[in-house]
Amino acid sequence: MAGGMSAECPEPGPGGLQGQSPGPGRQCPPPITPTSWSLPPWRAYVAAAVLCYINLLNYMNWFIIAGVLLDIQEVFQISDNHAGLLQTVFVSCLLLSAPVFGYLGDRHSRKATMSFGILLWSGAGLSSSFISPRYSWLFFLSRGIVGTGSASYSTIAPTVLGDLFVRDQRTRVLAVFYIFIPVGSGLGYVLGSAVTMLTGNWRWALRVMPCLEAVALILLILLVPDPPRGAAETQGEGAVGGFRSSWCEDVRYLGKNWSFVWSTLGVTAMAFVTGALGFWAPKFLLEARVVHGLQPPCFQEPCSNPDSLIFGALTIMTGVIGVILGAEAARRYKKVIPGAEPLICASSLLATAPCLYLALVLAPTTLLASYVFLGLGELLLSCNWAVVADILLSVVVPRCRGTAEALQITVGHILGDAGSPYLTGLISSVLRARRPDSYLQRFRSLQQSFLCCAFVIALGGGCFLLTALYLERDETRAWQPVTGTPDSNDVDSNDLERQGLLSGAGASTEEP
């Protein structure tokens, strides 16, 4: 109908909102036509394997700099607070780009968007290995471009998995996918440190990654499909029929989704702690080793730091075990306990806080105990990665998931790990400036700057307790086969049934 001449838009089909008025002077928005789509199970698992491999490389890129941080500080002559700014620039560019990629992922080819991101971050990473010490600002800029490329993948890949699998299958696949967060982080430390030791030059660590990323790009193009949005929930029919919503309407819907809001704040607390620990823990452990007299201080590159290898191996081991334990606990208990997923997240974060505190305060006394409690804290923290992703996919309607992922990434990073490495380094530098210059005082300054992490992670546990109050309601709304803008789901289901707007209990949509 042209020019808004008709009083009502045509009904989009069974289960749709019937006879919506477009308003004066406005055209009817184009309906989302369901398209039949199917994929053999083995193809879905192959696609998931490729996405997991790329996620591994993604997180290796995040933390490879931390594995060679001492060398970078020596080459570019930067202090702790400016070194923390490296990660802050990376994460800031990631969070600024995430809403853009979330918007594109909800409306355009997700496969093409991810491919562009891989090209961007691999090219910037390779270029950064050739930057002269005179142009330290250019090195910071290159890390920002790597963060921009990484945003495309972090935002879109979970939504593709959400459209390939459903229910228990999706929980298990997400568990495997998110295992590669700690595995990739740990391998980033290991690769950076090991390549530096083998070649005597930290720059080669940044030149190895683009080769692996070229393979990832080819596999993505050849083996990963771009399923219709909501395909898993609608038995291959694609997105639930209805009208396309604007980005502002999507954001307004998500702002009313309290499970999403509180879980996002919980993820923010996790990001704050993992960002600070991931960037500074290897240096903290090295300085503890120097204080204990187990290793001499480093005066020139290459700096030998066995703690990068140890912390990397610890991150991998605790990450794999933690993600599996968290996902399996969620899969089992959500069938018998309402709101089990956020309760699992809350319990693990509240238990992480004392572990981190003990790891910090015991480091000057016994390095072994510090490692034990640090490993236990990382294990408990890792229990949440797959679970929080499953919470998001279960409480958000399919056509808004890309935007939801983007907003969660943006908020989580802007209030979390965008500032925590810089803030930790800044506090350390301020404390050190007021004390005599000694290795013990350097260590104590960094130790005390870490203490805020234990408090922040406890706040995150409280946010997940609040998530549990709203989870069942928001899950029910997300599974309602309602069309129109996402805000139309914000209606009581009994009222919808009385109005004849629900077509039945099934999630599939049929063409009229």
Swiss-Prot record:
GO terms for molecular function: transmembrane transporter activity. Its main location: membrane. Changing residue 507 to T: In a colorectal cancer sample; somatic mutation. One of its GO terms (biological process) is lipid transport. It is found in: Membrane. It holds the Pfam family MFS_1. Residues 1-30, 481-512 are annotated as: Disordered. It is a multi-pass membrane protein. The chain crosses the membrane at residues 50-70, 84-104, 112-132, 145-165, 173-193, 204-224, 260-280, 309-329, 343-365, 377-397, 411-431, 450-470. Coiled coil: none annotated. Gene3D superfamilies: MFS general substrate transporter like domains. CDD domains: MFS_spinster_like. GO terms for cellular component: membrane. Keywords: Lipid transport, Membrane, Transmembrane, Transmembrane helix, Transport. Sphingolipid transporter. Belongs to the major facilitator superfamily. Spinster (TC 2.A.1.49) family. This is Protein spinster homolog 3.
